[in-house]
């Protein structure tokens, strides 16, 4: 299942703030998003910002138990976790992902701290009928990006480390264009500081195929209509 281009995705942490509201959010977001990223709650969300970090700590369940409460697949769904939590249990993660209807598992720390597991990760994803996905940064070596493209990933996620609510710096637009050139036709997703249709439009115009909103969604997850309205407002930036 491919990601729509241009696309709007939503990130939510599994079972935050509780199972019932999480399941309601999955249903709502599946109707107004092009894809979902579902965070696997961890005690060490080291690459997440302060708001998302709190959702990991407050989630009703932790680890794969939190993922198992729902079934996905109405739209492409990507599980997002840290490979350090599952370094010796990659097959278990892939099995759970496949069983709940996910398309891929994204590990932001794979390339930065566990590059030696790259081949294991790709093989395991494929063995369970999943597509690999990769988290890259603007300083990821070009030769590595070129290698990743050859694995035919579901997408490349470009991390840009900006804070919600600040104006997008010009250098970030430049970084998107540079990575766009490197990944060629591979789907490029960017997620950072997305809280308005203007920011969505800017990121898409810079060369991303899709954007993900996470932090700006957190305080809206308990209200289905508010969540829906916000996502539809952001979708205006794709036009």
Tell me the role of every PLM-derived stretch:
Residues 1, 19, 42-70, 86-91, ...:
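Active-site-adjacent beta->alpha loops and helix N-cap segments on the catalytic face
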Residues 1-13, 69-72, 177, 239:
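N-terminal amphipathic alpha-helix/helix-capping segment at the start of soluble metabolic enzymes
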Residues 8-12, 36-38, 76-81, 105-107, ...:
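Hydrophobic faces of well-ordered beta-strands that scaffold small-molecule active sites
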Residues 19-30, 91-94, 139-151, 185, ...:
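Catalytic cores of alpha/beta
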Residues 31-46:
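N-terminal glycine-rich anion-binding loops that anchor highly charged ligand groups
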Residues 32-33, 97-104, 124-132, 150-157, ...:
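Glycine-enriched alpha-helix->loop->beta-strand junction motifs that scaffold or abut catalytic
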Residues 76-93:
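Ordered, amphipathic secondary-structure segments that act as subunit-interaction surfaces
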Residues 230-239:
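Extended, intrinsically disordered, low-complexity segments
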């Amino acid at each position: 299942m491919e990601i729509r281009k241009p696309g709007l995705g939503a990130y939510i942490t599994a079972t935050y703030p509780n199972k019932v509201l999480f399941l309601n959010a999955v249903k709502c977001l599946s109707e107004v998003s092009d894809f979902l990223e579902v965070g696997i709650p961890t005690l060490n969300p080291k690459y997440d910002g302060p708001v998302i970090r709190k959702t990991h700590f407050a989630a009703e369940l932790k680890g794969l138990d939190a993922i198992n409460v729902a079934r996905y697949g109405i739209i492409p769904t990507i599980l997002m976790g840290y490979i350090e939590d599952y370094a010796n249990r990659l097959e278990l993660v892939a099995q759970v992902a496949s069983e709940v209807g996910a398309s891929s598992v994204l590990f932001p720390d794979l390339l930065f701290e566990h590059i030696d597991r790259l081949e294991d990760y790709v093989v395991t994803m494929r063995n369970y009928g999943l597509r690999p996905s990769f988290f890259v940064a603007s300083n990821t070596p070009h030769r590595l990006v070129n290698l990743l493209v050859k694995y035919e990933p579901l997408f490349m996620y470009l991390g840009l480390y900006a804070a919600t609510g600040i104006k997008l710096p010009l250098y970030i637009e430049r970084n998107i264009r540079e990575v766009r050139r490197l990944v060629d036709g591979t789907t490029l997703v960017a997620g950072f500081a997305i809280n308005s249709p203007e920011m969505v439009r800017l990121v898409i115009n810079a060369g991303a195929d899709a954007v993900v909103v996470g932090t700006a969604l957190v305080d809206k997850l308990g209200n289905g209509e508010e969540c829906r309205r916000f996502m539809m407002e952001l979708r205006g930036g794709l036009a």
